[in-house]
Each structure stands twice: as C-alpha cells, then as structure tokens.
Amino acid sequence: MARILLADDDARQLQLRARLLEASGHEVSLAGHASAVIPYLATSQVVIIDLRFPNSQGQPDAAEGLKLIRQIRESGCRAPVIVISGWPEDLSGTPEERMVSRVMQKPVAIESLLGAIAELVIGDSAPS
C-alpha cells in the first residue's frame, strides 16, 4: 500500500483518518501543524492536507495552507497532494490549485478518500 503523510490541525480528525487509512493497509505519518510537514515529504507517496491552518494569531487561515502547498512543491516533492477542506473555494482560482492533484470537500467519506489514493498512487504502480 501507500506511504501517506496526513496533515491537519484538528487532532481528532487527524487521528480518525489515520486509523481508517492504517486499517486499509496504508502506512501513515502525521503532522499536526503546517511546519511539521516538510521533514516527511521525502518518504511520502501521497500528501493529504487540510487547507486552513492556524496563522500567527492562532486563527484558521487558508493562506497558511496555500503557503504549505507552495512549500511542498518548492521542496521538490512530486507526490500527489490531496486537499481536504470545508472551504474548497479558498483554493479555487489560485496558482496553488494547479499544484494539487485533488480537492475534496469535508466531510469526506473514507471510501472516496481511498478511491482517490488508489487512483493517484497505487494505480501508478499496479501490475498490468
């Protein structure tokens, strides 16, 4: 299965998604804030992030997620990025929108997320 980096500032959602992905056979690394993502990129086959992370005032801010997307790509990481957000319109029309492989609106059914992972990652390495 896939090595997945999962990043979300909501610890409850982070743990829940991690358990569901691990139960499906995936290896999951967790990042509870945007600054914790970069060290895991080299070993991740897919990156799944929330869009809104706390800004310097502690308020949820899509600008933090957009900055994270740029940092992921500037690091040289070519892994598919899946954005899961309650506000996908925050990404719409931005340059960062072209840097991600999939945008999914919360709440996301685990079956939909697993399907996206299979399509973006596992499908690329499946025997023909």
Protein language model features and the residues they cover:
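Conserved acidic carboxylate
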Residues: 8
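Two-component/phosphorelay signaling modules centered on CheY-like receiver
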Residues: 11-29
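Acidic, metal-coordinating helix/loop segments flanking the phosphotransfer/catalytic sites
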Residues: 29-51, 55-56
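Conserved phosphotransfer cores of two-component systems
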Residues: 41-42, 71-78
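Conserved phosphotransfer microenvironments
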Residues: 50-70
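Hydrophobic/aromatic residues positioned on beta-strands within the core alpha/beta folds
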Residues: 84-85
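As written
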Residues: 95-104
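C-terminal output helix
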Residues: 108-117, 125
